[in-house]
C-alpha cells in the first residue's frame, strides 16, 4: 500500500468515492478543488494506492487556534472504496494523517461524522477518537 499526495489525476476516482458517500460530484469539480487544496499550505490530500490504483483518500486541514498555542487538524473526508474496506486502508490513511499532524505540532485531530454513518463512528472509536461536545451547523447560501 502506498500513501501519497493526491493530485488532479485522482479526480475521477475521488469523485466516484465521494459519490458512494452521497456527495455526488463531477471529476472536473473535484479537480478544481484539488488545485485549490494543493495551493493551500494548511491543507493536505492523501491518496491510498494499491496495485497502481487509488482506493481511498483523506483530506486534512490544519487550523490555528486563538486560545491555545499551535494548531489542530480537521479531517474533512476519509473515503475507502467499498471493495477495499476491511483491509486496513482507512487506518493507514488515518495513521499517516496523525503523523503529519503531530509533525506540525497539532494538539488534536477532529472529525465530524453524520449521525447516520454508524460504521464510521465504530472505525473512529477503535482508533481512540472520543465523542466530544455537540457540533452546531447553519447552512449558508454562497454569494
Label every model-predicted segment.
Residues 5-70, 76, 139-141:
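Acetyl-CoA-dependent GNAT
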Residues 94, 101-113:
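Conserved GNAT acetyl-CoA-binding A-motif
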Residues 70-82, 134:
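Conserved acetyl-CoA binding element of GNAT-fold acetyltransferases
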Residues 91, 103, 115-133, 138:
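Conserved active-site alpha-helix within GNAT-family acetyltransferase domains
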Residues 1-3:
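Extreme N-terminal starter segment of soluble prokaryotic enzymes
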Residues 77-80, 86-99, 126:
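Conserved acetyl-CoA-binding loop-helix of GNAT-fold acetyltransferases
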Residues 20-24, 87, 130:
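Residues at alpha-helix boundaries and the short loops/turns that link adjacent helices
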Residues 63, 81, 85, 114:
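Residue-level recognition of the GNAT/N-acetyltransferase active site
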Amino acid at each position: 500500500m502506498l500513501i501519497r499526495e493526491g493530485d488532479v489525476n485522482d479526480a475521477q476516482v475521488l469523485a466516484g468515492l465521494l459519490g458512494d458517500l452521497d456527495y455526488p460530484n463531477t471529476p472536473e469539480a473535484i479537480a478544481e478543488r484539488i488545485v485549490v487544496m494543493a495551493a493551500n499550505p494548511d491543507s493536505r490530500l492523501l491518496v491510498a494506492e494499491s496495485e497502481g490504483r487509488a482506493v481511498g483518500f483523506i483530506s486534512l486541514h490544519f487550523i490555528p487556534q486563538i486560545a491555545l498555542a499551535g494548531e489542530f487538524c480537521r479531517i474533512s473526508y476519509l473515503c475507502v472504496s467499498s471493495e477495499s474496506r476491511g483491509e486496513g486502508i482507512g487506518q493507514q490513511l488515518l495513521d499517516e494523517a496523525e503523523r503529519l499532524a503531530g509533525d506540525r505540532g497539532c494538539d488534536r485531530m477532529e472529525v465530524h461524522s453524520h449521525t447516520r454513518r454508524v460504521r464510521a463512528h465504530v472505525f473512529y472509536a477503535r482508533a481512540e477518537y472520543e465523542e466530544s461536545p455537540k457540533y452546531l451547523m447553519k447552512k449558508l447560501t454562497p454569494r
